């Protein structure tokens, strides 16, 4: 999550799992993208409509740019690998920059949106949008939401969540 009162006060948080530090890295790069976008807004337009963020789509594009275009690039992997090897020698000493780059760009279905690869991330967003439309149009009852969620994940990603935490409740 990234927020702040103005471009001079940008704060963000990240999650961290010692068993999977890449989730923290890419989450941090994502939130950095939000922060950099906020810090780049024209200060002379503060408190005016033209000085506000251009919308969630543009905001998200900037966070995804840092997470994926920068963070998943070969150049970044080659820069990062000595640092990973220094801090995680038992796991990373024999890994090259290209090996890291290939592994962080692997495309495969996943249950959790914020951990999804660049290709399937958009399917996670599409599924949420389709479910939202059904809810708003009265085509889906709240009580049926968990099953509808799992059905759409199976239809578009070929996977079902083993529990509600990794399924319909993951964004809470």
What feature does the model see in each segment?
Residues 1-8:
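Catalytic zinc-binding patch centered on the HExxH motif and its immediate surroundings
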Residues 8-9, 170-172:
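An internal, amphipathic alpha-helical element
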Residues 13-27:
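Short pre-active-site segment immediately N-terminal to the catalytic Zn-binding motif
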Residues 23-43, 60-64, 131:
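Active-site recognition of the HExxH zinc-binding catalytic motif
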Residues 32-40, 68-82:
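Long, well-ordered alpha-helical segments
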Residues 72-171:
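Long, amphipathic alpha-helical stalk/connector segments used for oligomerization, subunit docking
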